[in-house]
Regions:
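N-terminal targeting or regulatory segments adjacent to alpha/beta-hydrolase or S9 domains
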Residues: 1-45
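Alpha/beta-hydrolase superfamily serine-hydrolase fold, recognizing
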Residues: 9, 19-22, 46-48, 53-277
């Protein structure tokens, strides 16, 4: 899809989200994550499409779901999907659907999605520990690091980069690529777009009570810690990154600043900014 085409659809979606998130309706509960938690608790069991198989893997502190194509699976690469949710929302059916989409657009790559622990019950470093355990699981299953692609949106996109900082600092091999959609990379909320898009962001804007100001995950830790806010880490040696973000998002700076810093440090980065989204 061309960015111009996406922008037209994006404007329609933006206006719809802005209406739904009106504080007089249910906006506050959407923005602060309360509705997400309630929906997550009440979601019906997900029915896996017949073209896929889905296995649940129990780890010590969390579970994971491994989705595979039944016909012609791609055995060259595997995707580790890290879900979003502001580090306070557990995995939802939407991410099971995302796993299927990832499998389809990648011509059959399998997708591992950890339902990592979230705050406030499990603040930092729980999510990072579980993401690392999921990565190690793939290695233990015979995958090589150069076969692993890490994908994530929002908190999941930031967690993908935080995981790579952790892997590099601990002498581990990094994945072959990162796909990040609207990654949350600056939990210190210091970027320009936190102010310039405050009135325009239909999902998180116009309130300081939204998920992106929630401190449950950070706790008493330093928000400038690269394992919490990957923007502040050293990107040298990182794999190629694909970053996608909307121009109206408060998280725009999180993407733009990461892309600029990573490029300066020799990383191959492609960033797509979709106007009006």
């Amino acid at each position: 899809m061309r960015e111009s085409e996406a922008s037209i659809r994006g404007r329609v979606m933006r206006d719809l989200i802005a209406h739904v998130t009106n504080d007089h309706l249910i906006g506050k509960k959407i923005k602060n994550g309360e509705l997400r938690k309630k929906i997550g608790d009440s979601e019906p069991p997900w029915k896996c499409p017949d073209c896929f198989s889905l296995d649940v893997i129990e780890m010590d502190n969390f579970s994971m779901e491994y989705l595979q194509a039944k016909e012609n699976p791609n055995t060259e690469k595997v995707i580790l999907q890290l879900h979003g949710g502001g580090y306070v929302g557990a995995m939802r059916n939407a991410y099971r659907m995302f796993a299927g989409l990832y499998c389809e657009v990648s011509h059959g790559m399998s997708v591992l999605t950890p339902d990592y622990r979230v705050a406030p019950e499990h603040p930092y470093p729980a999510a990072l520990e579980d993401a690392y355990a999921a990565y190690c699981y793939l290695l233990e299953q015979g995958w090589f690091s150069e076969q692993i692609i890490i994908a994530g949106d929002s908190a999941g996109g930031g967690l993908a980069m935080a995981l790579c900082h952790y892997l590099k600092d601990h002498g581990k091999q990094l994945p072959c690529g990162i796909v990040a959609m609207s990654p949350w990379t600056d939990l210190a909320a210091s970027g320009e777009s936190y102010e310039t898009n405050f009135e325009r962001d239909p999902l998180f804007g116009k309130t300081r009570d939204s998920l992106i100001y929630n401190k449950d995950y950070i706790g008493d830790n330093d928000p400038y810690n690269a394992y919490i806010s990957p923007l502040y880490g050293d990107f040298r040696g990182f794999p190629p990154m694909l970053i996608q973000v909307g121009s109206y998002e408060m998280l725009l700076s999180d993407s733009v600043d990461v892309a600029a810093k990573a490029r300066e440090q020799g990383v191959k980065v492609r960033i797509s900014i979709y106007e009006g989204m």
